[in-house]
């Protein structure tokens, strides 16, 4: 950040009074700019025993497979954002279920949230950010072509939980959570 969004004057990085972290501060108007992580919201769209994945048409990781997800928009909830991204990227209408995974990606200044989702029909089509969209059984997922560690981790947790009967037991389950390190590779 170089300029203040309030008055357009240049900003400087310093620790403001009564704070403990370096921030972008405008010396002209006194505005302190807090740079916060961005939320990436998505879903695990399920139809029967299959999961819907999208092959990315954009960078980063062009040509790799991912769950439908993207940046949360101002004015929407995380679950509404997950449903919107699923429709935009995969052309699928879903009923959003509970939050399933929360993955912290501090080196990318992001938090990834994935919701369980049930497709309302078998209809789907690639959106502008997807080369193709397909339903996969667990054994057919192209595991070596998954775009991001957060997606791979979420899918691994999902299939392990499904195999253990967590989803069919009717019992409450906790949100899966962990931090993704910058050194993690697919």
Q: What is each model feature region?
A:
Residues 72-157, 161, 165-167, 181-186:
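Unchanged
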Residues 46-88:
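Conserved Nudix-box catalytic region and its N-terminal flanking loop in Nudix hydrolases
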Residues 165-176:
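Short, flexible loop/turn segments with low-complexity composition
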Residues 1-42:
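Acidic, metal-coordinating catalytic segment for phosphate/diphosphate chemistry
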Residues 5, 12, 27, 52, ...:
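Nucleotide phosphate-binding site architecture
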Residues 45-46, 53, 117, 135:
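Conserved hydrophobic "DFG−1" position in protein kinase catalytic cores
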């Amino acid at each position: 950040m170089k300029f203040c969004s309030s008055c357009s004057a240049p900003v400087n990085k310093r620790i403001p009074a009564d704070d403990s972290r370096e921030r972008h501060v405008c010396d002209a108007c006194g505005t302190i700019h807090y740079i916060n992580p961005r939320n990436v919201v998505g879903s695990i769209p399920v139809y029967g025993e299959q999961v819907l994945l999208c092959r990315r048409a954009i960078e980063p990781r062009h040509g790799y497979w991912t769950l439908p997800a993207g940046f949360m928009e101002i004015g929407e909830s995380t679950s509404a954002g997950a449903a919107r991204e699923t429709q935009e990227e995969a052309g699928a209408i879903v009923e959003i279920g509970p939050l399933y995974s929360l993955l912290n990606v501090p080196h990318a200044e992001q938090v990834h949230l994935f919701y369980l989702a049930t497709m309302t029909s078998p209809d789907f089509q690639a959106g502008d950010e997807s080369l193709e969209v397909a339903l996969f059984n667990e054994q057919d997922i192209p595991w070596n072509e998954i775009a991001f560690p957060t997606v791979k981790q979420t899918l691994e947790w999902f299939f392990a939980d499904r195999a253990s009967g967590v989803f069919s037991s009717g019992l409450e389950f906790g949100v899966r959570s962990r931090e993704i390190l910058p050194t993690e590779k697919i």
